[in-house]
Amino acid sequence: MLVWVLYKIDPRKVWTYAEHANGWLLFVTVVLATLTFPVRTIRWRLILRDAKGERFPITPLWHATTIGFMANNLLPARAGEVARAYVASGQLPVRFTTALGSIAVERVFDALVMLALMAVAIAAPSFPAHAQVGGRSLSTIAASTAVLFGAFLLVALLIANRPTPWLVLVERIARRVLPVRAADRVLHASDGIVEGLAVLKSPARFAGVVFWSLVLWITNAAAFAICFRAFGLAVPLEAALLLQGIIGFGVALPSTPSFLGIFEAATLVTLQLYGVESSLAVSYALTYHLTTFLPITLLGLWSLTRRHIRLRELSTAAKAGTV
C-alpha cells in the first residue's frame, strides 16, 4: 500500500514540505494526539468493571492501554487489541475474554461517533460535491456503515439485557459442531463477552461512554486540524472529521505494524478530495504518522518495563488470540 502511495511522488517535494511545516503547531498536534490515550483510559474504566461492578484502579488500565497501542505500532495484525486485554487480565481480577469484550464495545462506540462526525463534514457547504471513494458516493458509504454498526450496537444491547437465550444458543451450536474442549473454550469466551457488554445495561455508564467517545474523537480531529495549519493546507477544519473517519475505518482490519501504508493511503485519498496536491498530502501523512507514533510507542515500552512484560510475550499472546 505504501508503494502505491509513493508512486510518482517526488521525495524531494515531500521532504521540503515537511521541512517547512510549522514546528510549534506540529508540537501542539502531537500533544493533542497523545492526549487521546488518557481519554481512552478514562472511557475504558467506565466500560470494564470487576465481578461486583466496581471500578478498577486507573493505573493498570493506563499501562494496558499504552502497551496495547504500542503493540499496534510494533506488531502486525492489530495485535494491540489482544495485547491490551492480555495485560489487563494479567494485572487485574478480570477474564481475558471480558477485557476483550469491553474493547469490542469501545470499537462499536468509536465507529458510531466517527460516523456521526463524518456526517457533519459531509453536510458542510465546504464538502466537495459528488465526492467518491472506490467509485461509490462517500455519503452512501457512510450511511451503509452507520446502519451496519447501528445493527451491531442493537444486537449487543439485546445480548447485554437478555444474555441467557444467547448463551443457550451458543452452547447448543458449540456442543453439536465442536469437540468437548473446544466447545468449553467457546462457552468460556461467550461468558466473558457478555460480562464485557455489561456497560450497555446502565444508562449512566452508557451516557458516560458516549460523552468520552465524543471528547476522544473531537480531540483527535483537532490534532488533524492543527496539523493542516502546520502545513498551510487550504482545507476547511471540518475536513479533519472526514479524514479521521476514513483513516479509522481504513485501519480497522488487521494490517501492517502501525498501519503503515494504510494510514498514508487514507490520508492521500481524503486530502485529494479537497484538492490538495499529492506530494503535499503525502508529506502531511508521513509527518503526522511519524510524530504521533513516537510518544505512545515510548509510553508503551515504559509501561512494559513497569509491568515486567516482554514484547515477545505480547506477540505470543496475540498469535494465540487467547489466554
PLM region spans:
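Alpha-helical transmembrane segments of MFS and MFS-like solute carriers/permeases
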Residues: 28-32, 208-215, 246
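Membrane-embedded helical hairpins/re-entrant loop segments and their flanking transmembrane helices
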Residues: 41-65, 227-243
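Anchoring transmembrane alpha helix of integral membrane proteins
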Residues: 1-48, 320-322
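Transmembrane alpha-helix interface/packing and boundary motifs in multi-pass membrane proteins
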Residues: 32, 68-77, 228-229, 244-264
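Juxtamembrane inter-helical linkers in multi-pass membrane proteins
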Residues: 60-66, 70, 169-193
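Alpha-helical transmembrane segments and their immediate interhelical loop/hinge regions
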Residues: 184-231, 235-237
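Helix-boundary and loop/linker segments of multi-pass membrane transporters
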Residues: 14-22, 54-58, 92, 195-203, ...
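Transmembrane helix-loop-helix hairpins in multi-pass inner-membrane proteins
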Residues: 1-16, 68-178, 260-323
